[in-house]
Amino acid sequence: MWKLKIGEGGAGLISVNNFIGRQHWEFDPNAGTPQEHAEIERLRREFTKNRFSIKQSADLLMRMQLRKENHYGTNNNIPAAVKLSDAENITVEALVTTITRAISFYSSIQAHDGHWPAESAGPLFFLQPLVMALYITGSLDDVLGPEHKKEIVRYLYNHQNEDGGWGFHIEGHSTMFGSALSYVALRILGEGPQDKAMAKGRKWILDHGGLVAIPSWGKFWVTVLGAYEWSGCNPLPPELWLLPKFAPFHPGKMLCYCRLVYMPMSYLYGKKFVGPITALIRSLREELYNEPYNQINWNTARNTVAKEDLYYPHPLIQDMLWGFLYHVGERFLNCWPFSMLRRKALEIAINHVHYEDENSRYLCIGSVEKVLCLIARWVEDPNSEAYKLHLARIPDYFWLAEDGLKIQSFGCQMWDAAFAIQAILACNVSEEYGPTLRKAHHFVKASQVRENPSGDFNAMYRHISKGAWTFSMHDHGWQVSDCTAEGLKAALLLSEMPSELVGGKMETERFYDAVNVILSLQSSNGGFPAWEPQKAYRWLEKFNPTEFFEDTMIEREYVECTGSAMQGLALFRKQFPQHRSKEIDRCIAKAIRYIENMQNPDGSWYGCWGICYTYGTWFAVEGLTACGKNCHNSLSLRKACQFLLSKQLPNAGWGESYLSSQNKVYTNLEGNRANLVQSSWALLSLTHAGQAEIDPTPIHRGMKLLINSQMEDGDFPQQEITGVFMRNCTLNYSSYRNIFPIWAMGEYRRQVLCAHSY
């Protein structure tokens, strides 16, 4: 039976806070009772049976384990679920009962170190490169035991579409990228070309052009594997590292995720590394092409991409650049004396990989970069200690649920905890849930980054991180503006609570450090980027080499990050009015202008990290209201309310499809279904913007939907994915279904039900 381990170290692991926040799964053949084994198998069968209609796992294995460990059984004395008829009004008693049941359930799945473990997955390109990398390096059986392989195979088959292909993400239509990577991974894991649905998957691949039609990232991976040729890839020249730092194309100006992908990719490209050509690789060369491998025109293949994958087509100027580098640049750089430049560039590239590894404790910024850095370190020295340290951190990325074993983007431990604290505090029930808040407070304090990156971090194109919070945990090390702001808010709110209830508050200097990070990130237009100050020209996006992402080349400002920063600074200003007051006032004023300028004519804001207009509008409204705006003095807020009211469904909820993010047009979920997370965002926005002062009826109706949707155990149902990134890929946050209904109910009780009668 699989067990989730919390806060545990092990051989080859390094931590700066004793592994607080670490979560990883291990298989224990002796764990569990026969009844638990039977229940787990039932949950797996249910998911597989419904996999085409319900594509997101509900994180049921983790929830089952933690409820047992926290001694919450089926006989716990919780009130019965409230169900209100259309004719009934919401009463304080009904609302408090629902809140109590919701927080009781959510407290029962809190880890002992204070965070709430949860899935953060959904893309169908995180897992397969790891399988390929471990196969290339010969470490597959060392890292993946029989149970790992069994659950990975389960996951990939569970998320195969009815047409035989696999999507870019689990809710998406079939793509060559997802299909080819998944097919290859299954073959590596021992599935035969005719096993189960493999033949159907291969048919989809061949019917859509074969492996030559895989996008650029896929071409890179199957080349490194040996099932494709470097001559069929557009160049990834490491020589960009040799450009002067002021050059617009210098990697130091890239978005950190782009830079950290390019570092190891350029190293492997410059080495023209290819893994061992085994019998399996030779078989893949026959299985996945529509013509003999030795007759493929690799130059033509460079820019061949299946139409199903083509979200961001290359502009002509980009193809001209790749053509020049391919036909001219590579010839020069592989001949003496120009080859000396390549050797120098490779040295710089791998040194940057070293720096990222060491400063992230071999976690790296995310799963895509992790696998690339791992294989780069193996190519550099297969017997190195660094490679062993990389292997030791792989389990940090595993997540297991009823649909199988998957790889997370990384983890959302801190992000979820900061929201959860605010949600519980909004309900005014802190006395009853003091132990929950105390543990969460401990986690927040232990997760703040206490130091900047090592050495001359500016020379390594890193920004300050002392005082920040990461998306996940301290060991990760990467500062994020909105995570820092939400962490600051949570810590400030808890500092106002009695220490005997929630524990001692953070030292004042640590609040100051957090504010320093936030202020350092604001752009000249008033907006806030996510990780680092904006430092590149927007036209560089013309050279985005991926065909399936948008806005991936440079750091940019986000409505969500700006809204969070405004809230954090506004709350800090109330508690510490003398600290950098003029700077904070100017910062907030500029941020307000940015938010107002980014509003769409229909009153909405586009959200880049959640789906989509509902999400962006929530952050914008929260930012404006935290800084003194309301429906009486802000046209932006009145327009926001009008927008949200126009999208309320006949069932009183809101439900927005991921297609909104892709197409940049608000799109309802199929069948006009309501999504409880998005409904909660809309209700929070309307509540804080002051809609209840105009007409509270839409809020009452939406709140009744939340109350009636609660499950018997106090949980809320898992519905459609609500996270997104780079406009075209979804990400599931399984804790959102608990956090945001709790938060919306708490604010409704305080600001609507107790202030505005029916």
Swiss-Prot record:
GO terms for cellular component: lipid droplet. It comes from the Eukaryota. Expressed in root nodules. The keyword Isomerase applies. Induction: Down-regulated by methyl jasmonate (MeJA). No effect of gibberellin A3 (GA3). PROSITE patterns: TERPENE_SYNTHASES. It catalyses: (S)-2,3-epoxysqualene = lupeol. PFTB repeats lie at residues 149-190, 511-552, 588-628, 637-678. It comes from Glycyrrhiza glabra. This is Lupeol synthase. One of its GO terms (biological process) is pentacyclic triterpenoid biosynthetic process. The keyword Chaperone does not apply. InterPro entries: SQ_cyclase_C, SQ_cyclase_N, Squalene_cyclase, Terpene_synthase_CS, Terpenoid_cyclase/PrenylTrfase. The active site is at 482 (proton donor). It is an enzyme of class 5 (isomerase). GO terms for molecular function: lupeol synthase activity. Pfam families: SQHop_cyclase_C, SQHop_cyclase_N. Oxidosqualene cyclase involved in the biosynthesis of lupeol. Required for the production of betulinic acid. Belongs to the terpene cyclase/mutase family. Keywords: Isomerase, Repeat. Its EC number is 5.4.99.41. SUPFAM superfamilies: Terpenoid cyclases/Protein prenyltransferases (SSF48239).
